[in-house]
UniProtKB/Swiss-Prot annotation:
It comes from Cochliobolus carbonum (Maize leaf spot fungus). It is an enzyme of class 1 (oxidoreductase). One of its GO terms (molecular function) is oxidoreductase activity, acting on NAD(P)H. This is Trans-enoyl reductase TOXD. Its EC number is 1.-.-.-.
Length: 297
């Protein structure tokens, strides 16, 4: 019996470092990884605060070295490979599915090899973000892939461009050939432009949404909302074309306009496994997992 250090949830709604956590058992479609670096996400503290029962391993993003490969994994990982990706940390259904530990198990075919030009620390920041952006842009909004960019730029609004998800989304949407419009605070304007944003607006300004509609000649029909609260949804509604369009969020918010199709995505669904969140039961989504295999490096 082998123990390790890990961060786990405990009542009342807090987490702590333990030194007696068992090394997780390797499932057939998972890989065993020795972690080198991890990264933090808002979902980590949300799981600790209200989503996870006691005893769940915390953490989603990681980078590390493969120790063992499950027999059903299709990707040709081998022991010693440098890999990165994410897990469903704080998972009430599988309490060992977290990354804040010395040795972890992660769904094999959803993980990625680390490019030689990236350190473990850099690679650890990509897991949740890449899958989330992949879902939001390419599965939900059905953008063209960066490998086959569109020839004539179509406008897309990425609300919340200076967030971790937003910075990734700007770069990928630009590579896909779109005219990228984003929002952030003024001190981030130059960063947004350096990442590829064509137009940047201050979301604090009450006239910004109207300016976006005018700048796009009332043709903005694609929106990816990385903030996903009522205020951001209302902003996006005002910016979008009067003819309607597609609105993709990261939380359960929507635009009431009948000519706008609203939906939201959750990165955990790319794992293809059922789970519960705030008493909501999410069924397995095999097709989402199939698409998720492509949201990597």
């Amino acid at each position: 019996m082998t123990f390790q250090k890990a961060i786990v949830t405990e009542a009342p709604h807090r987490a702590r470092l333990v030194s007696d956590r068992l090394i997780p058992k390797l499932r057939d479609d998972y890989i065993l990884v020795r972690t080198v670096s991890v990264a933090l996400n808002p979902t980590d503290w949300k799981h600790i605060l209200r989503l996870s029962p006691p005893g769940c391993l915390v953490g989603c993003d990681y980078a590390g070295i493969v120790e063992e490969v499950g027999r059903s994994v299709k990707k040709p990982f081998k022991k010693g490979d440098r890999v990165c990706g994410f897990a469903h940390g704080g998972n009430a259904v599988f309490s060992d599915d977290g990354t804040f530990a010395e040795v972890i198990t992660v769904k094999g075919d959803i993980q990625a090899w680390i490019p030689e030009n990236l350190s473990f620390q850099e690679a650890a920041t990509l897991g949740v973000g890449i899958k989330t952006v992949g879902q939001g842009l390419y599965q939900s909004l059905k953008l063209s892939w960066p490998t086959t960019p569109i020839e004539h730029a179509v406008p897309i609004l990425i609300y919340g461009g200076s967030t971790a998800t937003g910075t990734l989304a700007i770069q990928l949407a630009k590579l896909s050939g779109y005219r990228v419009i984003t929002t952030c605070s003024p001190h981030h304007f130059e960063l947004m432009k350096s990442l590829g944003a064509d137009l940047v607006f201050d979301y604090h300004e009450i006239t910004s949404a109207d300016h976006i509609r005018r700048c796009t000649q009332n043709k903005l029909k694609l929106v990816f909302d990385t903030i996903s609260i009522d205020v951001s949804a209302r902003f996006c509604d005002r910016a979008m074309s009067t003819e309607g369009g597609e609105y993709s969020a990261l939380l359960d918010v929507s635009i009431a306009r009948t000519n706008i199709s609203s939906r939201w995505t959750l990165a955990y669904t790319v794992l293809g496994e059922g789970f519960t969140s705030e008493q909501i039961v999410f069924q397995p989504y095999p097709t989402t997992m199939s698409s998720g295999r492509n949201f990597g490096m």
